[in-house]
Amino acid sequence: MKHILKFTFFFVTLFLFSCSNNSGKGNSVTNNLSEQLLEQHPQHSSKFISDATKKVQQLINENKYTPFDVLQSQKLDKIEENSEVLVDVSTPNKMNGNQIYSYLKERTLLVGTSYLCNRCPNIHLNNASGFVIHEDGVIATNYHVIEVKEGMNVSGLFATDHEGNVFPVVKVLAASQSNDLAILQVDTGGKKIKALPFAEEELMGSDIYLMGNPFGNTFLMTKGIIGRKFISERDGELKIAVTTEFGPGASGGPIVNTNGQIIGMVSAIEMKFANNHSRQGGVQMILKEAIPVSVLNKYVKGN
């Protein structure tokens, strides 16, 4: 018996960089690694999510969203399709952890479905993660984030940036259940949003940073390395094992290298028990699984 827990995350950041070779859109440069970027306005996570939920309710009341069943039909039509989205493949200058945090926070999103519960008349919002891959409102997240939830009255799908701007998901551009990824179009109302550039390949042992919203802790960043590339026993697809911490709410979150390039996307965890697959032996290890950028690149186009 496999104990796989899938999670959802979301992030966004604040900082301008230029690139060392190409200057990518929204990626400005800083050569000063000693520069300190202070968090001027720490977030109150529950208030942030509550405010986002109110904005979602308003969009639904004004019928400014795409119904979830329409998105599901689109998803089925886009299984294993290339999104045809032209992504940035430039290489920004290396950054330290402080700079990466601000950079990631501007480019990460809280992604979640809106739903009605059976205890009150209010809209609720599931918390997951995603990230921007094109400035015109194209984002990436996990397939399981946009799956139909059994027994839930789901109305729509929404993405929220770190400033609290809420964008309805209006179209599914590509989806892969086996690779647990989805590429979506959101309506930004004409607003340009900063995107993450894509690396060509994931490098074993390299330092990485991850951002997400585990357990409702919005825009939480963790650090680790890529520990392994492997073929999953569960689905036969290529995955990477990472040592960055994450939990429920971080699914779909971006994983970047020290240049701020996407090298993977959060997907799942697998608990390993002392007594084989029996919980009686106690948890001995938790493997963190991510989708490598070499897989993500199959669903986009590089410029």
Where are these regions (language model features)?
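Serine endopeptidase catalytic core focused on the charge-relay Asp
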Residues: V154-G156, D161-H162, V170-I231, V256-N259, ...
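Active-site region of chymotrypsin-like
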Residues: E106-I123, D187-K194, T218-N303
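Bacterial signal peptide processing site
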Residues: S20-N22
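Sec-dependent signal peptide recognition
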Residues: K2-F10
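N-terminal activation segment of mature serine protease catalytic domains
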Residues: K25-V132, Y299-N303
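Catalytic-histidine neighborhood of serine endopeptidases
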Residues: N127, H134-S178, M204, R279
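Short, surface-exposed secondary-structure boundary micro-motifs
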Residues: H144, N213-P214, A268
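C-terminal motif of bacterial Sec signal peptides marking the signal peptidase cleavage site
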Residues: L16-S18
